[in-house]
Amino acid sequence: MKTGFWQQVLPKRAGRRKEHPVQYMPHKKEENATGLMNPSLHTSHSAILK
């Protein structure tokens, strides 16, 4: 029974992670201005998205 439970929960968590970057997209656009001044910060953000 536990395996079936996790099979239902894990896909939902994976789906949430995929939606996570989309929810913060407007926020990332605001950080883009600071990212231009701080290239290292911008690189770390793009690395996380990929």
Curated annotation (Swiss-Prot):
Residues 35-50 have a biased composition (Polar residues). Residues 1-50 are annotated as: Disordered. This is Uncharacterized protein TP_0799.
